[in-house]
Amino acid sequence: MPSARPGSLKDPEIADLFNKHDPEKIFEDLREIGHGSFGAVYYARCNLTREIVAIKKMSYTGKQSQEKWQDILKEIRFLRQLNHPNTIEYKGCYLRESTAWLVMEYCVGSASDIIEVHKKPLHEDEIAAICLGVLSGLSYLHSLGRIHRDIKAGNILLTDNGVVKLADFGSAAIKCPANSFVGTPYWMAPEVILAMDEGQYDGKVDVWSLGITCIELAERKPPYFNMNAMSALYHIAQNESPTLPKNDWSDAFCSFVELCLKKMPAERPSSAKLLTHAYVTRPRSDTVLLELIARTKSAVRELDNLNYRKMKKILMVDTCETESAVGDTDDQQDDHAGGDSSKSNSITSEHSIHSVGVSAASSQSSSSNSIPAAAQNHHHIAAHHHQQAASAAVAAAMHHHHHPHQQPPPSWPSGQQGQPVPPGAVSRNSSRHRNRPPLPNIMHSMNNNVTPTNSASVVPAPAPAPVLPPPISVLPHLSAMGHVGGGGTGTGGSGGGSPASGGPLADRIQPVQPRYLTTPAAQAAVYAASSASSQQAISNAVNDHGPNNFATIRTTSIVTKQQKEHMQEEMHEQMSGYKRMRREHQAHLVKLEEKCKVDMEAHKTALDKEYDTLLHNFTRDLDRLETKHQQDVERRAKQTSAAEKKLHKEITLKQENDRKVYDLNRKKEYKANKERWKRELSMDESTPKRQRDLTLQSQKDNLKQHEAQEEQRMLQAQKQYIELEMRKFKRKRMIMQHEHEDQQLRDELGKKEQQLQQAHAMLLKHHEKTQELEYRQQKSVHQLREEQINKQHDTELHNQKDYMDRIKKELVRKHAVELRQQPKSLKQKELQIRKQFRETCKTQTKQYKRYKAQVLQTTPKEQQKEVIKQLKEEKHRKLTLLGEQYEQSIADMFQSQSYKLDESQVIECQRTHEQLEYELEMLTAYQNKNKKQAQEQRDRERRELENRVSVRRGLLENKMDAELQQFNQERAERLRMKHEKHTKELEAFDNESIALGFSTLSLIEVSREAYADEEGSLSGSMISLAHSNSSTSFPAGSL
């Protein structure tokens, strides 16, 4: 489902994040106090509560609008969840014209603002108090599973009550662990730089950044700050952890920093554990931060007063070479004091202020004295022009204070050499101005981002229109609130790398403008001071507009410098592009891994479905087989019952027929015996008839009795026979049933064995398919990683070469400026030498006149003409010799200065070339090491996958062998149990038969009955009984 359009509030969850009111009606008196890649931060007052707040305006239009919108939503969600004394307080958020207004708690400044104002490191107790507040805030964040990922002095804010606040959560991670490339380069932990290559990281990256911040507060800049930011990344990833010099700091502080900067995250303590460190818990004053803030405010006020006096001096005093030179000297000293500060101390993430000056300014400061001191005379003369350029821009400021939305006034007509000439600003000594070379606007000498090695020797081209010099007044506030919590506090507030630390404050500050002269309206009022009532005009401007005295320890020059540096987007775009590329790489990799995961899940689901279908088919087949067996058993039981009944019926019918035949034969025999007995008796006539009748009757009775006995015996025999045959039939049928059950069991077990073999074959097939998919997915992931690392290395090399080209071009420009300025400097020195020559000539002329007068007083008058001629010739000879000496001095000076300049430039070029080559070599070595580690990781992952596949195959085979063995055991057990059951049933039947009077042998004899086949029809069976007649029914001689 595609993401919603940036700024759309159709989603109720997103709409709930923003207030529905118009922020321009709620907040007033907006004053810009910070600037960065996200936009700007403003001081403001709420009309409803009269509360002072800071507003971070973030635009989500232009390139990557969807990404900007998601970043805004993430920061809002993050801030809404925080509730801790050491995190910035969230006030609300509004939407207006494609811009999000993020309203937060207002703070007076950041730790970087303090070192920027004082131009010197903080004390250990002050750093410890700041660390305690930071650790408390970090411990709270880490307990919620959050990571800040951009801890630095510029993001550590202070309130008027001395409470430390963590700000700028634009780079924060909502989940822990994380693995994205986010943060400010100089403060990044090694595991963040290597996040994509070596896995994830946790909240201990904030502990590393805190350690770097401690070094920043102790040395005014973080390690590797004189390097290109890209180069710093490679050094952080490869080199050992930075340390503090133990001679300058206590053991507890050095130990604390050393623990924070443990290279291995596992050895680095957590933020909660560091809260118990001796450095943080040792006794100190409870008001150490309050005193620091008060001292900083006092220093800022001193800066205001000093610069106000300078501005008044510029406006009120007529041009004077001596005064101008003094003023220019002060300005140059101030420029030197803040020279390195042109380089901001952070290249922030998308939500941090990005601002990086040219690092060559700080890395090449060793050549700052390569231009001869004589060249500075030119700049003493040029100070007046700087002051005029500054005064020409002041009028617009006061006017803008009344009308902040109006356009600035048009430029005044240009004077000589293209310099702007404000009305009433033409000096009485304008004839001298026409002979002076063009000089730069004071803006360039004070706050140019490209700080030259020798600020006294580089004079940029004149500006076509007056530009306001950036004042260092107590203007709003911290680094980009930034200072209030968002984005980019670091740039404005960090002190840069100014080498001037120590000495009186007045010698270490930049010339600034009072806070009440920061607007065009105020400047316009000050311009009126060039008239006779200038002093009254300045007082009126101050009274009318007030001192803008809202609480802050941030100077106006920081804000102005942020705005100027943000205009130089090249380095910002380069670093932002690099971060964006790393994030895109991470997103592509995550997307591919998610796709692989989804494909694997779908693959496993398909395989599981196929296997489940097979098992379901197996179950269905077994159920069908069991049903068939059950039906077969029931059918056979019915057949057995029917066969038993039929056999009983047939035997009964046969026996009835036998009895009928027996009765018929018995009657025949009885009749035959009766006739025979009658014949035999009738032949014996001697026996009386009565006796013969009695004898016949007796024989008849005996025969009937015998026949009755025979009949009874036959019935008993038939009964025993039918019972025996039925027992035999039942026994045989039981044996047949047992055999049939055995066959059914064998069929079932055979079916199960066949199914088990099919299941195992399918499992092996699935294993092969899964293995093939895993290898294919791993190959695609490895290929993507390799392509990404190659692209990343190409980008890094391209960025490094761009940086080298930029440094070389800037060095060439600097040398060209030095060469252009050299004739001016040499001309000034030549003029000084010629002036000395003229003064010497005047002195010698005076001495000659006095000497001539003395000689003529003692010389006779007739010889005076000759003496005068000789003295004149001597004078001409000495003056000629003196002129030649001065000309030779000028030539020697030209040659010496040219040689020194050439030599210093060659040395500077050589050092710069060596430094750039060293950085390129470090980058190449880092990339080679990175490639080697990446290849080793891929090989290791490949081996691990092969091992996993092999182990899985082994486990699968072991499982199949175990299942087969279990099946064999189950089959043997079931066969055994079935055999035992049948044996017991047969034994019980035989015992019952014995109890009924049947012997086992008689039961196992072959039956004389023809049983129907088990599968055949009982109707087709024939029962054949042995032939029986009456003669066989009686034993021989029974008659």
From Swiss-Prot:
Substrates-to-products reaction catalysed: L-seryl-[protein] + ATP = O-phospho-L-seryl-[protein] + ADP + H(+); L-threonyl-[protein] + ATP = O-phospho-L-threonyl-[protein] + ADP + H(+)
SUPFAM superfamilies cross-referenced by the UniProt entry: Protein kinase-like (PK-like)
Annotated compartments: Cytoplasm, Cytoskeleton; Cytoplasm, Cytoskeleton, Spindle; Cytoplasm; Membrane
Binding site for ATP: I33, G34, H35, G36, S37, F38, G39, A40, V41, K56
Gene3D superfamilies listed in its UniProt record: Phosphorylase Kinase, domain 1 (3.30.200.20), Transferase(Phosphotransferase) domain 1 (1.10.510.10)
Needed cofactors: Mg(2+)
Disordered, as annotated region: 324-457, 485-508, 629-648, 677-707
Annotated membrane topology: Peripheral membrane protein
Lipoprotein as UniProt keyword: no
Organs and tissues of expression: In the posterior midgut, expressed in almost all intestinal cell types including intestinal stem cells and enterocytes (at protein level). Maternally expressed, ubiquitously distributed in the egg and early embryo and enriched in the germ plasm at the posterior pole of the early embryo including the pole cells.
Keywords assigned by UniProt, alphabetized: ATP-binding, Cell projection, Coiled coil, Cytoplasm, Cytoskeleton, Kinase, Magnesium, Membrane, Nucleotide-binding, Serine/threonine-protein kinase, Transferase
CDD domains named in the record: STKc_TAO (cd06607)
One GO CC annotation: perikaryon
UniProt feature, compositional bias: Polar residues: 341-350, 444-454
Chain segments annotated as coiled-coil in the UniProt record: 631-765, 835-993
Main localization of the protein described in the UniProt heading: cytoplasm
Assembly: Interacts with Schip1; the interaction enhances Tao kinase activity.
Function: Serine/threonine-protein kinase which regulates the Hippo/SWH (Sav/Wts/Hpo) signaling pathway, a signaling pathway that plays a pivotal role in organ size control and tumor suppression by restricting proliferation and promoting apoptosis. The core of this pathway is composed of a kinase cascade wherein Hippo (hpo), in complex with its regulatory protein Salvador (sav), phosphorylates and activates Warts (wts) in complex with its regulatory protein Mats, which in turn phosphorylates and inactivates the Yorkie (yki) oncoprotein.
Protein's recorded name: Serine/threonine-protein kinase Tao
Organism expressing this protein natively: Drosophila melanogaster (Fruit fly)
Gene (name only): Tao
